[in-house]
Amino acid sequence: MPGRRPEVSPPPKMLGTVHGALCLSLVMLLLVAVAPGPVPAAGPVPGRQGLGPEGDMPISPEDRCPVCAMLPIRYPRFAAAIALTDGRTYYFCSPGCMLNAWLHPDIFLGCPAADLKRPVVREYLSGEVMDAREVFWVSGSDVVGPMGPALVPLKDQAHLEAFRRRHGARKVFRLDELTHDNWQTLTGKQRPSS
C-alpha cells in the first residue's frame, strides 16, 4: 500500500552479534562466580630471576622497579636489588628507590621488614656488586641518576674521598643510620609516605 511503511526488523547479522555478546557476558559472569578463591590484587612483581650467588643481578627486560615502575635494565650502572627470605628478588632502577623499599617494605614490596634478607647495589666507582649495608652512602653530589639527584654507594673510605673530590658530597651515612624520620635530612629527598 502506498504511504504505509513496512515494519523494519534488525538485520539478522545484528541480532546474532547482540545475542552472541549476551551469551559471552553470561558465560564470563558464570566463570567469575565459580572461580576458586579471590582474584589476586595487583601489587609488586618480583624479578623473573633471583640474585646470583655472588650477588649478580640477572635483570630481565620485563622486570620493573616496584617503587616507580621504571625498567631497571635501562639503568645498569644504578640498578639495585633486595632479596627476600623466601627467595623472591625485587630489582630497582636506582639506589634511591631501593632505599625507599628498604625503609618501607610493607608499602613497596608487600612484606614486613623481617622478610628482607639482602640489599644489593652496584658501587659507583668500581661497578662492583656489594651488600648495601656495607657501603658508604652519599647524598648531595653532582651525580644525577634515573630518579634525579643520586644517592651514591661507595665501598670504602678511599673511594669516598676520591668521589668527594670529583663530585662533592653534602651528607655521608650508612644504611643502618637511615630511618623514616631522618630520610629528608640525610638524603635531601622528600620523605616517602608512610
Please report, for each region that a protein language model flagged, where it lies by residue.
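N-terminal secretory signal peptides that target proteins for export/translocation
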Residues: 1-18
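Compositionally biased regions
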Residues: 10, 24-26, 194
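Bacterial N-terminal signal peptides
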Residues: 21-33
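Intrinsically disordered, low-complexity terminal tails/loops enriched in metal-binding residues
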Residues: 34-194
